């Protein structure tokens, strides 16, 4: 009985977790307002492609890695280096709780992503961005988006 209740609650949480998808153009506008267009040489389409390949625009996505660390939020920021999840050792270079990276208010996420991109490797720190976005035409990510 307890096991069935746990499965039911876990399933409900997964459904809620999947419901925090931001529209591509809404994200573009927020990123533009936070001065990410051209930040460290990366365009808005780079950021949109990153958000898509990492989380499919899911602000509340959490993913466990084989090393026991977790990736959080729309950019899947890793707990081993960038945020504190209070579960495993973290360098916490962004000085932020990992749970803040799941907030619909993307300011903490954006500040942390800026810190990551400003360091060695830039967006190449995200393997999925390297595999699916780097060196590809990305302008279509802005199709239909009006920033003004």
Curated annotation (Swiss-Prot):
Span of the signal peptide: 1-19
Superkingdom classification of source: Eukaryota
Active site: 54, 71
Listed GO MF terms: lysozyme activity
Keyword Disulfide bond annotated: yes
Glycan attachment sites: 58
Cellular component terms per the entry's GO annotation: cell surface; extracellular region; sperm midpiece; sperm plasma membrane
Cysteine pairings via disulfide bonds: 25-145, 49-133, 83-98, 94-112
Residues annotated as domain C-type lysozyme: 20-148
Keywords: Antimicrobial, Bacteriolytic enzyme, Cell projection, Cilium, Disulfide bond, Fertilization, Flagellum, Glycoprotein, Glycosidase, Hydrolase, Secreted, Signal
SMART domains membership: LYZ1
EC top class, as a word: hydrolase
InterPro entries recorded: Glyco_hydro_22, Glyco_hydro_22_CS, Glyco_hydro_22_lys, Lysozyme-like_dom_sf
Cellular localization per UniProt: Secreted; Cell surface; Cell projection, Cilium, Flagellum
Similarity-based family: Belongs to the glycosyl hydrolase 22 family.
Subunit structure as annotated in this protein's UniProt entry: Monomer.
Function (record text): May be involved sperm-egg plasma membrane adhesion and fusion during fertilization. Exhibits bacteriolytic activity in vitro against Micrococcus luteus and Staphylococcus aureus. Shows weak bacteriolytic activity against Gram-positive bacteria at physiological pH. Bacteriolytic activity is pH-dependent, with a maximum at around pH 5.6.
Protein name from the UniProt record: Lysozyme-like protein 6
């Amino acid at each position: 009985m307890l096991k069935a209740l746990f499965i039911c609650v876990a399933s409900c949480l997964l459904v809620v977790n999947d419901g925090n998808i931001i529209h591509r153009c809404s994200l573009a506008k927020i990123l533009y307002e936070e001065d990410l267009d051209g930040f460290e040489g990366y365009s808005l389409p780079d950021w949109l492609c990153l958000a898509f390949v990492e989380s499919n625009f899911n602000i509340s996505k959490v993913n466990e890695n084989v090393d026991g660390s977790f990736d959080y939020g729309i950019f899947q920021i890793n707990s081993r280096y960038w945020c504190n999840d209070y579960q495993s050792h973290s360098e916490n270079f962004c000085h932020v709780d990992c749970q803040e990276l799941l907030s619909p208010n993307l300011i903490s996420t954006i500040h942390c992503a800026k810190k990551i991109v400003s360091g060695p490797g830039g967006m190449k720190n995200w393997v999925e961005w390297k595999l699916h976005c780097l060196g590809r035409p990305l302008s279509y990510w802005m199709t239909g988006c009006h920033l003004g």
